[in-house]
């Protein structure tokens, strides 16, 4: 210990100066934001390097005035002071702890979060400790933090392990170890929640909790508590650090010592025996590897701590990924060793076998292993990179509940990369974390490094509940998945930790510290793998998250960005993640809905549900997704949405994660997509419009249709609306199309008259009014046939103008049209010798038209005038007029049908089509016969009867068609409006 302390720059100036020399390389940086007071009187705790005064080992927090820390560090004295509960007893106790069942150790590990990471700057108010309790994400946080702690602790433990037994002072350590250990046991029994209890300490999760507890030792002084890596300096920290850590610190210490010659021989294996008796102190080389690795991590963390908080933020971003790499590395350690071997393998063994036992039993049995093994292994299917559907579903629900967890599942690829970074960590003794991390990044690809670092891949299998014999290849997949989830969660927690007040993010915060420490490595990885950042946060698609390598999901998950200002800087990445989250939310939807969109794939518009889903899920996306948008593109569903956003109607059906820049489709775009879908029938192109417009169109169309079931009213209304909408090239086109389709009867023959009528109508002064123009429909059929055909009605204002004037204009147009037809038919009758039947038809049509104009039209005109007369006592409302007009439309349609027939006859040289016409007449006369006894003795009477029957039939048919059309129009408009409105509102809300 002394040698280590001497060789290493002292983190603690012999005074309580806030800037303490880092354990490693004596980084000049002060602990993040730690006030001098809170900077930990490392000397007090860690008397310097060599001296391990029991009192000096008191947790820095205890020694330091609580208020001094930049972040209100609630002094963890409460929990720190519970020496007996200290999870890290003296070496003897540590040995006991090591002897303790893995479950207890796991519990302790879970509880360990109390350890300060030694980054006092990164203190965040701890949320309810319990809140962190059970979520897999939290477990992963714990795992990662434990891993990080392990890495960081290795160096600090190296300093502390031998002498302090990991308890700060042996005396305090024993007390704390016992008391804490007892409490740890209780916590172990209690489970994760107890670990959460740790958060209770000050109600704040501070990086110090992890790093201080874990890395505080190195800060305080190698001698005092390196083993505990935290502020083990006191029983308080020791409490938090199990002897596993102490052992690790011992092992790591050795490793560090070996790795860094400056680190004098780590305290004799006493710590290792105590901490990892089962592990047994393996070759120093093993320790060296692990130790150096942890040393690097620790030194990185330490340096990070000493760096400015800004550096911390930057490093956090980096270290987030880098640390994930480390954590992933643990997870990924390909190891043949089915279990953590009791003895650490020599570096050669570890290198050769990649199965070297994990240096720390804590690593072996740590709850983080369980968390990783149970959750990740389950999710990863014990070897499969992807979680089982059940696991994924569980994750999704759990992630939804704890958005933080989403990150867990999103970083499979990145985790491997980062894990690889561990290799670099191993070799470097106390290089600047940036330097180390850059090489680490370079070496990230070496799984062997990971295996070396971890010694045993077996840990990974354990973590994943995977066959311990699984090799790197399999493990890498599993680990990617598990690490992805775990690391992504860690990242998410880190991201959250950045924000963090979230209690569950303590680990992540600690991770973020390590990540910050390892920022260099993680930066490369982060930048290298947009996937890791861009992978859509698991939020949207937990299932996708596996495929999505990014751990960026972390961000998305954090619904509550904690106020931690220093972390805020890192948050941008989180934001990126958020973008991804949104995307992943979309991905989830888009996965299902991209298929939908593919199915619907209307102009490739993203489904409203997709956009809604994505927008809904990622409130955080909205928040943070902005930056990461490009990275987020991974979810192809989002990609589809993105295309729509770009305005590309091409459905981006591909769920390809290839589009890294996939952006959340704007609500408007998605809305557009949505609208086309609701419009079903209408051409998507026309429907592709802003929802608001569509809604109005629908409303306008629907309003008239609602006012009257009469198809004519609907037609006229739709005609008006459709004319305007057609002009606007919106869904009106489909409507118009439907109307023309609705009536094709004799359209050809009538077209000329219609045109003439239109011209005639146009000639009228009223035509200037759009309503009048609209009314200047060709023959009545045009109402049915082509509501859109009426060019005269360009203005939807008609809908707004539905008053007496508007209806008068419509009435005038209809009157003129009917009069024109009547005049034309009279002329035709005079000019041509028509058969009695034809004459009867002509007379019937003309008479019906004249009767309608003379009676109902006049009545309607009177109603319109009354409507225009404010003084009219029974003054009819526009709705009344619309209803009456609907009734008139029925009559007009009947007459129009008659004139259509006449036009057909005219086209046929006024020759009745015997076959069809007479057959129809004959067929129809029978009904008339029953209704009206077939006593007609004259052909005329028969013609009349046939005409009457035909007329009735036609009228019935017309009414039926009108009703169907009106219903269809209303249904379409209602559906469109409803869909567009529903979608639009959610979309807007989501966007908001």
UniProtKB/Swiss-Prot annotation:
Region Disordered, annotated ranges: 1-31, 157-225, 342-396, 527-751, 763-798, 915-992
Compositional bias segments (type: Basic and acidic residues): 1-20, 172-194, 915-925, 940-958
GO cellular component, one term: synapse
Residue ranges with Polar residues bias: 199-208, 576-591, 969-978
Record field: compositional bias (Low complexity): 528-554, 600-620
Mode of membrane association: Peripheral membrane protein
Compositionally biased intervals (Gly residues): 162-171
Entry-annotated residues carrying Phosphoserine: 206-207, 377, 380, 384, 388, 405, 415, 421, 580-581, 609, 611, 665, 744, 973
Sequence positions bearing Phosphothreonine: 915
Family classification: Belongs to the SAPAP family.
Subunit record text: Interacts with DLG1 and DLG4/PSD-95.
Physiological role: May play a role in the molecular organization of synapses and neuronal cell signaling. Could be an adapter protein linking ion channel to the subsynaptic cytoskeleton. May induce enrichment of PSD-95/SAP90 at the plasma membrane.
Name of the protein: Disks large-associated protein 4
Lineage: Eukaryota, Metazoa, Chordata, Craniata, Vertebrata
